[in-house]
């Protein structure tokens, strides 16, 4: 089961979140049938949103949009504060690797664009923030958002490793933040440790990558685990929700679906589930609108 572990240095100088998101990203790949680069880009976005959602309180809903002008198009993710996330990528078929190393490429195919967050607190006044994409690698873009919009300098690591068949092998990440009151000496020690950390891909390849991430972040510094919470890919779409959407259409449009298509099929963008509405279903909707 996927999870996020929240922890804090015993000194109170900084905190860290580490995530195992392997099942989340694997299910997203399965539902959207994404190729290598698209899988990694979508996976990183889902992990970023899992981190962002874990930082919220109450029943907030968090939307992350990574909008580029190159091959991927846009990537949309929606998460809640209960550990659920869903998402999709506009172009599922990007499959580009470095010839020499086989490394999956992401940044060069995101292009110029924006990292957009919408936090809905349920009050009717969602908070929206937009920052430019810095590298298109998503992790760096997320870190820039946290620094610029939330005024919280953060170290971020996100990645998805694929097997020889380009299926998700492991996915996860971390966030480290200095807390108010940290001394200059503590901040310097924290920065030095982060500079010396192995690459996120190396840590994820460890046998137990969650423990490997925590060890790399804290080193010999004492820390305590605050909580461990489950994470999952879960879509909240339903036939009733799409039926309500059809009810907003004019009668003429519903009648055209009956006359021309003998029904309607609606596909959820976030999870690919297909909902069929036959002629009788549409006629019932027309009668309900009468």
Curated annotation (Swiss-Prot):
Coiled coil: none annotated. The keyword Iron does not apply. SUPFAM superfamilies: Hsp33 domain, HSP33 redox switch-like. Disulfide bonds join 235-237, 268-271. It is found in: Cytoplasm. Under oxidizing conditions two disulfide bonds are formed involving the reactive cysteines. Under reducing conditions zinc is bound to the reactive cysteines and the protein is inactive. Redox regulated molecular chaperone. Protects both thermally unfolding and oxidatively damaged proteins from irreversible aggregation. Plays an important role in the bacterial defense system toward oxidative stress. HAMAP family: HslO. This is 33 kDa chaperonin. The gene is hslO.
């Amino acid at each position: 089961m996927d999870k996020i572990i929240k922890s804090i240095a015993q000194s109170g100088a900084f905190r860290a979140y580490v995530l195992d998101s392997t099942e989340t990203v694997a299910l997203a790949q399965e539902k959207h049938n994404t190729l290598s680069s698209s899988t990694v880009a979508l996976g990183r976005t889902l992990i970023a949103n899992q981190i962002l959602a874990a930082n919220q309180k109450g029943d907030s809903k968090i939307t992350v949009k990574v909008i580029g002008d190159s091959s991927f198009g846009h990537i949309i993710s929606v998460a809640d504060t209960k550990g659920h996330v869903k998402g999709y990528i506009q172009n599922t078929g990007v499959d580009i690797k470095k010839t020499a190393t086989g490394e999956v490429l992401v940044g060069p195919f995101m292009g110029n664009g924006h990292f957009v967050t919408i936090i809905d607190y349920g009050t009717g006044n969602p908070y929206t923030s937009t920052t430019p994409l810095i590298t298109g690698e998503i992790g760096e873009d997320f870190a820039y958002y946290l620094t610029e919009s939330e005024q919280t300098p953060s170290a971020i690591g996100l990645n998805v490793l694929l097997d020889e068949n380009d299926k998700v092998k492991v996915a996860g990440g971390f966030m480290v933040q200095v807390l108010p009151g940290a001394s200059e000496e503590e901040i310097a020690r924290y920065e030095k440790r982060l500079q010396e950390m192995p690459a996120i891909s190396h840590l994820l390849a460890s046998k137990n990558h969650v423990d490997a991430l925590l060890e790399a972040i804290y080193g010999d510094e004492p820390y305590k685990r605050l909580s461990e919470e489950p994470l999952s890919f879960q879509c909240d779409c339903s036939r009733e929700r799409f039926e309500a959407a059809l009810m907003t259409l004019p009668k003429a449009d519903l009648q055209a679906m009956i006359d021309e298509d003998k029904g309607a099929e609606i596909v959820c963008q976030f999870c690919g589930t297909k909902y069929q509405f036959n002629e009788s279903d549409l006629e019932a909707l027309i009668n309900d609108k009468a």
